[in-house]
Amino acid sequence: MGFELDRFDGDVDPDLKCALCHKVLEDPLTTPCGHVFCAGCVLPWVVQEGSCPARCRGRLSAKELNHVLPLKRLILKLDIKCAHAARGCGRVVKLQDLPEHLERCDFAPARCRHAGCGQLLLRRDVEAHMRDACDARPVGRCQEGCGLPLTHGEQRAGGHCCARALRAHNGALQARLGALHKALKKEALRAGKREKSLVAQLAAAQLELQMTALRYQKKFTEYSARLDSLSRCVAAPPGGKGEETKSLTLVLHRDSGSLGFNIIGGRPCVDNQDGSSSEGIFVSKIVDSGPAAKEGGLQIHDRIIEVNGKDLSRATHDQAVEAFKTAKEPIVVQVLRRTPRTKMFTPASESQLVDTGTQTDITFEHIMALTKMSSPSPPVLDPYLLPEEHPASHDYYDPNDYMGDIHQDMDREELELEEVGLYRMNSQDKLGLTVCYRTDDEDDIGIYISEIDPNSIAAKDGRIREGDRIIQINGIEVQNREEAVALLTSEENKNFSLLIARPELQLDEGWMDDDRNDFLDDLHMDMLEEQHHQAMQFTASVLQQKKHEEDGGTTDTATILSNQHEKDSGVGRTDESTRNDESSEQENNGEDATASANPLAGQRKLTCSQDTLGSGDLPFSNESFISADCTDVDYLGIPEDECERFRELLELKCQVQSASPYSLYYPSSPLDAAGKSDPESVDKELELLNEELRSIELECLSIVRAHKMQQLKEQYRESWMLHHSGFRNYNTSVDVRRHELSDITELPEKSDKDSSSAYNTGESCRSTPLTLEISPDNSLRRVAEGSSEGATANIEAYRPSPKNLLAITEDPEVSTPSYNPSAKELDPSQALEIKERRGSDGSRSPTASPKLGNAYLPSYHHSPYKHAHIPAHAQHYQSYMHLIQQKSAVEYAQSQMSLVSMCKDLNSSNSVEPRMEWKVKIRSDGTRYITKRPVRDRLLRERALKIREERSGLTTDDDAMSEMKMGRYWSKEERKQHLVKAKEQRRRREFMMQSRLDCLKEQQASDDRKEMNILELSHKKMMKKRNKKIFDNWMTIQELLTHGTKSPDGTRVYNSFLSVTTV
């Protein structure tokens, strides 16, 4: 609204008036048509009417209104009277100075500040009133015993009632106390929410740290494999200097739809026919225990010439992939393999093979045993401790063969030159290269390739690697960074010919350090994965037990894979773009089979990002022939002998705690007496070891944080990024593909009505996650306590299985295993629930079985990892742990209700139910839960993909005609939009109905009708039922005779006949 006209001193220009309120404009806004109005007038009009108030144009929105600053400044310079002119203020000020004057105007209204007065006065008279005239001003304190302040009015009246004054004072204090309690509750709620958010952030950070550790362990395994393969070839001279090439013919057979190797190379395009020999198809990676890794199979660096008679020597990468996809078994592959030339030498004498030292293989088990020893004078270890991943080699080479050409080539570095041609269709295509240059050495002015975009032209070509040095670009020798940028950013060139150089043995500097650093890295990985492995092993054992009960006790991979009625395409995933939310059923089933065949590997995939499992982070683009069906444990980063190694570690630790710490490796050591005489030394060493592990964990966290900061710096470094010239800094992140974790599915159940209490299906976000009672610190102590029963019992006690966990609280007599022949007739999930209910019948007492309590149930106060998903730092918050305990209680109650309902429906569930499948989901805080989802969703996704493929070549008219006749399939996003529109329409419909009811009520209230009494309402009810049943069980004959023949308007109502028989 505008300013009143009579407040201004003098006449006001009519152009400064608002056309709506006819007052002086206040914060003027203009419409696109040129009209000016007050902001308080035009905004409600536009929101309600949607047009200009002058009715000069069509639709108008509030975003189209603009401020008129010159007009506003002109209005602010007008003279205006004070708003308190009616109270006596005669000041006339500028409009822009009016707010400042109102703050200190003496004629502004103000209230007395004494409690109990509240008289409205002028601001200039408040002080005098409070000092002289106010009856509520204090004049002293009561001397009659209450001690409360005495006002002037009470003193003039002759005193006050102390009891009434004390009651009033007490009430005021109670009101203040209540207000403080409310404020305290609000602050507590706010602090609780803050605490939960911080705990969630800490959990997410811990999960990200674990995933980063797993990713680096995966890279470590891959680099170790590369180093092994290069070390085997280090004795052989390079090609053309002592090597010969021979042709081999191999026969391959697919194993579960996979060939088990990766390829790189190929010509960049079909039109380029003059390719060099370096553009062939080469084997870049071979999966262990795969079809290609068998004896007489492929080897790394083999060049593929033919596949089933089809020449691939000059084929492109895509043609080679298609040839392997369409090849029929048996697949006959012709390859070229480099072999060292045979050298004629005389056998060395026997004295040359004699080693004067003693080979001692010190592995990780020895180190863990030595850390448990007591402190007094332990034996001095060899400073070069080799990790288990790199055991000492016992092979002996001939000195003449091994040292043949080393000395003469010691002072010069062998470089491998290669010319790479890149072609782009238009100037918008990106080459995908990120270049950098050295700044620490003045002599080295070369340009190096730091990163390659996986989806770029260079990555698809596959010949350029990270770390290559660019020598020439299009025949021009590159001297500095500016020349390289100018040549690569030229929009006129579509063909780029790059001459690159790389060492023949390209080794990373990070893996050339001494063995002590390698051992420390392995110790970091073991420490970070210790808690993660235990949680994953328990979940995997639960899933494995359920699969075991379904299949009748068999865990054969072939049996599980035969349950899937799907066919493999013959080649595994060859395009990373297929990893999206709407993945095909074929790929999901492949991952299901892997998770069921190897539960530990399946659970490991839950926490690994895509770049740890795929091949996207290799320095060259490759296509994978590795199907998800045959992926083994080694390929997922877990060695095959890891479980056996872990079991041996447990036995070793048990022996260390139960026997002498030096009796394992030094049976006759004189330090045995010292270890036995000091029983507290073991605990001290354990504490020292735990402190050391915590310090290493903090160091690892700092390394990860520094790595992230370095990545951020690299992203904003202008010298390394050339966005508009075809370069791009590609960063592989953990969170980029985190949504893939929610797409991992388990094998579908045949019929499962309710979720079992052994699984937490988590149908909503409020469900309780899986709760594990596993203590990494106390696990060894529990095993050591039962070590008198044998090492085998200790190992089996450490492995938590569903049977053991369900029988924790049973009596020894009830928990005796027995075979139930009728269990096969029941549904697997029902049988599992019945078994769990048997275990829960004996769990009403607070104490557990003494035999099983020590082995499985550690105390809450002694176990820092009672819940697998609760980090150690989160257990210091009492409110958070209290919340977890409440969730556990709710979960137990829900499981009991689920068991009761399942037992009731065992005999009545004969109807055909929809097929369901298990899905492993992940929450925002990092916890996982298992849920059931109908197979119908997956079928709908496949149907959507099929319809999309069928309609890809249709025109608009054909598509419209098909929608009218055949109906249309709505995608997921469109269905969400439909739900939102339906909710909006329902809300509008309810609003209209409510408005109509309110209107009717107002009309009824406007009429001068008298209010109906109970008798009239009873007559109205009887009129509705006069042609129906006369009376019911709650109506007496007297009521019918009294009310049945009357109506509110006085007319007679003819009811049905009523016969009364008096007995």
Swiss-Prot record:
UniProt-recorded Gene Ontology molecular function terms: ubiquitin protein ligase activity; ubiquitin-protein transferase activity; zinc ion binding
Keywords for the protein's UniProt record, in alphabetical order: Coiled coil, Cytoplasm, Metal-binding, Phosphoprotein, Repeat, Synapse, Transferase, Ubl conjugation, Ubl conjugation pathway, Zinc, Zinc-finger
Coiled-coil stretches: 680-705
Species in which this protein is naturally found: Mus musculus (Mouse)
Subunit annotation: Interacts with NLGN1 and EFNB2. Interacts with UBE2D2 and with MUSK via the first PDZ domain. In myotubes, the interaction between PDZRN3 and MUSK is enhanced upon agrin stimulation.
GO cellular component: cytoplasm; neuromuscular junction
Compartments it resides in: Synapse; Cytoplasm
Protein name: E3 ubiquitin-protein ligase PDZRN3
